[in-house]
Amino acid sequence: MKQRIIIIGGMGPQASLELHRRMIQQALADGAKYGADFPHIVHLSLPVPDFIANESRRSEALEIIINELKDIAASMDDVIIIACNTAHLLQPDIEQRLNIRITSMVDAAIDYVSRHYKTIRLLASPTTIHTGLYDKPLKAAGVTVLTPDKDEEQALEVIIRAVISDQAIPQSVLDKIPTTTQYEQANAVSYINNCPSSPPVLLGCTELSCAFAEKPNTIDPINILLRYLTIKGVL
């Protein structure tokens, strides 16, 4: 029996669906042909209240996640993943309450970035930025982290909400993110050749992984996590 992968998703659902889709794509790339070749995935797409925008609902969100994990008897034998970067703020409480271990996408990204880069630019939700979820450990590892200004933060929030609701992202909003606009206007080869010193962009929100998938000079925690799981033999 394959090791069970549990995706704690729904925050938002488009992003956790993208993580699930890429897991299946990874299995196909590794030669999966029949049903039994694919990973055993339990995807909990949970209608969790928006505790990211409303901190007062954090306890309510935590209880929903814990109760769902109890219902499926989550244990140390499972590979448990939180599909939302910001929701990793709940990781210590979940692990302590249920005596389980979560395979952290955030930790995997921090480890990768700290080994490969001296400076990065962080694009993420305002909560991820303000809590230092990425900033603090990366800076402690000697990485310079460039964070969005206020206008960029507001634009990122609009982009994240658009992905969650499956709406088109207005070009006027994209134009407020200079780095992504630059990527959009140049192909990968010319951008890398002409701007080799530009710091790479860490997509510190899975909605941004959806919005800017495969853009040049980006670091995608979803892909880092998939490589980690592949190396560990989980996928």
Give a label for each model feature.
Residues 1-235:
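Non-catalytic structural scaffold of enzyme domains
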